[in-house]
Amino acid sequence: MRRLTDSFILGLAKGAVIPGLYTFRMTEGRSPLGQIGVLITVAISFLLTFKRFDPRFYKPIGDFKIVFLSLMAPKLPSLLSAVVMICLIFSEMRLRMILSRCVMIMPSYSPAVFTGIMVSLFFKSQMFDDYSVLITAASLLPITVRYGWMIRSSGFLLGLQKYRPILKSTSFREVDLKCLVKFTVEFLLLFTILWIGKMFLSMPKSNHLFFLTVVNNVFFKLNVFKAAACAVVAILSGLMMNVCLYRIIFEAFVGLGFSSIMLNLSSDLKDRSFYAGDLLNGFFCLVVCCMYFGV
């Protein structure tokens, strides 16, 4: 029961932390130079978190306070808002990285993690926009309180013994890189299709919660190239007939393609000397950047 609860808590926090969501919203109406600065900040924050880091020495209360205070002050003078934005994106990246690693290390239940993500995403819908700060805080509070006990559990400590840093791996160039090429090529294909679809299907400003739900799916796998082909057909159909249904179909197939990549990556690389959690986090952050930037 405790393992099930911990899995749900991890999912609740993962659904609440979407790196760049609020930061990209703060760039609406800004100059191209300002938007480029945001992209550079996001890239630097991700690279700084993609490093060897022992989750046992992490205390989530610091990032919880930064995220909470940053979301409470969205309308500030430009200089102060830039500082808030930088602090927020760094905390979101670090928190998401830790959560991704913990899900890979712990013997967690994928359906429970997915359920937690679904609950968080539901409360991020537009009908709850006025309570977004409170909802985010409520979603992050359980992991903030529970984290200390979670990392001292026997399951976590046993899993941590298998979770070796990529830089210390002797087989990285021989095995892991070959596996990585396949996933990277598939991801770049879908990423390109997502970018093209975003430009030509005139996606409205929204939270894209349906798309994020499909991306986080853990129940269905689809051949990535079939998903890409169906997404391209949806783009062409949407260009010929301006119907909202084709945008939904497009998001569904692209999302299923991304989720299939992540599910295959988790099963293939989980027990190898590779930071699979970091790679999953990197893929997710790139998808979020493509979907939300410039909307």
From Swiss-Prot:
Subcellular location as annotated: Membrane
Report the principal subcellular site. membrane
Keyword list, A-Z: Membrane, Transmembrane, Transmembrane helix
The record describes its membrane topology as: Multi-pass membrane protein
Is the Transmembrane keyword given for this protein? yes
Give the stretches traversing the membrane.
31-51, 66-86, 103-123, 131-151, 183-203, 218-238, 243-263, 274-294
Name of a matching Pfam family: Herpes_U26
GO cellular component assignments:
membrane
Q: Which protein, by its recorded name, is this?
A: Protein U26
In the UniProt record, what gene is named as encoding this protein? U26
